[in-house]
Amino acid sequence: MKTDTSTFLAQQIVRLRRRDQIRRLMQRDKTPLAILFMAAVVGTLTGLVGVAFEKAVSWVQNMRIGALVQVADHAFLLWPLAFILSALLAMVGYFLVRKFAPEAGGSGIPEIEGALEELRPVRWWRVLPVKFIGGMGTLGAGMVLGREGPTVQIGGNLGRMVLDVFRMRSAEARHTLLATGAAAGLSAAFNAPLAGILFIIEEMRPQFRYNLISIKAVFTGVIMSSIVFRIFNGEAPIIEVGKLSDAPVNTLWLYLILGIIFGCVGPVFNSLVLRTQDMFQRFHGGEIKKWVLMGGAIGGLCGILGLIEPEAAGGGFNLIPIAAAGNFSVGLLLFIFIARVVTTLLCFSSGAPGGIFAPMLALGTLLGTAFGMAAAVLFPQYHLEAGTFAIAGMGALMAASVRAPLTGIVLVLEMTDNYQLILPMIITCLGATLLAQFLGGKPLYSTILARTLAKQDAEQAAKNQNAPAGENT
């Protein structure tokens, strides 16, 4: 009798253990619906704000250009007005950043990476208005900046805002919604949903906590952001370069050569960005007056440059289709490339609220097209199309500089709708990334974040040192 009872109890214990194992297995893939709902809200808000930011920047640019058109026949008014308008707009952006939210300067992507590791604050009530209005000023002034950095930072801050509004306390929700907003922001800037997802997984891989909950939330946010973008802007690719021809197998070695070139250019470009940042820091020394006046001078010069050589100013989206179509000579392409390198360094490294993705894409297009046109002359038997090298170059500089080849490949293919060029894109971006790494180049955003954290630690140490002894105990 005791034996039967013991056997029955043992069987019951085994059944309970199996049920518990099955229950845990089923719950392992159970995503809290609240987080998915919040991710959808974050994606929708980011899409709406991203579209509003794009329209606002275009409105400021059109107003500025319209004012210049009114005095186009009077040179003595045109040139001073071009400088003054752009200078004033730029000064608005610099002043707001320096006065109210220093973390809103630059692209903002390193700030999101730092926030994902709980190393940087997320003051959304300050960053959102400063980044939006400040970006309207600097981008509207015609400075060589992109809107993708602002939308990524805006998206991440919207994620934290939603978290605070709905009073969600868990660390998982805080991290997930921040990453969701950042991914939705990139998607809203470029109409590139897959690139937005890959950007979080690849570029922010050291900070992103990859699990089923977070990745589902990122997918949900990106979907909603993309839907909102396409409702307002349609489904056409953001950069119209037309359908380019395929790259024959016997020409693929040329794309590897192009990747090697960008593998050398990427680390040099990153080094120049950091050195220019140091130069500006030595100039203004943190004084707001000097910083704003310096920003106004850079903005005014961009306004003048926009009259002399329009292709050398602005984010570069209008330049890319023109350059990729082969409308410039090799010499002119290289001249514009050098001019835009200088203006990109001045605008981005000065701390203006604006991104560097779009300027890098334009630089890659210019150098890639120049290489393609030269290769077409040297190897006429291949019947090369320079535009295919322009597409490959767009992603290659980003791959070598940011060290995110997958994001660069997919982003360019989504933006141009030339998916047939995926093989030459892979070859070029992989070659650029490997050589940049071999040469000792560091990812741009990670390096900027490290410098920001070092500065933050130094400021905190100085504050603690200057504080009265009683306050430190």
Curated annotation (Swiss-Prot):
Task: Give one GO term, molecular function aspect.
Answer: voltage-gated chloride channel activity
- Annotated positions binding chloride: 107, 356-357, 445
List where in the cell it is found.
Answer: Cell inner membrane
The gene for this chain is clcA
The family classification in the record reads: Belongs to the chloride channel (TC 2.A.49) family. ClcA subfamily.
Assembly notes: Homodimer.
Q: Where is this motif: Selectivity filter part_3?
A: 355-359
- Intramembrane bits: 109-116, 177-189, 193-201, 387-401, 402-404, 405-416, 417-421
Reactions mediated catalytically: 2 chloride(in) + H(+)(out) = 2 chloride(out) + H(+)(in)
Please indicate which superkingdom the organism of origin belongs to.
Bacteria
Locate the site labelled Mediates proton transfer from the outer aqueous phase to the interior of the protein: 148
Query: What name appears for this protein in its UniProt entry?
Result: H(+)/Cl(-) exchange transporter ClcA
Show which residues form the site (Mediates proton transfer from the protein to the inner aqueous phase): 203
**Which residue ranges does the UniProt annotation give for the motif Selectivity filter part_1?**
106-110
Q: Which residues lie on this side of the membrane: Periplasmic?
A: 70-76, 233-252, 310-329, 377-386
Pfam families registered for this protein in UniProt:
Voltage_CLC
Could you tell me the membrane topology recorded for this protein?
A: Multi-pass membrane protein
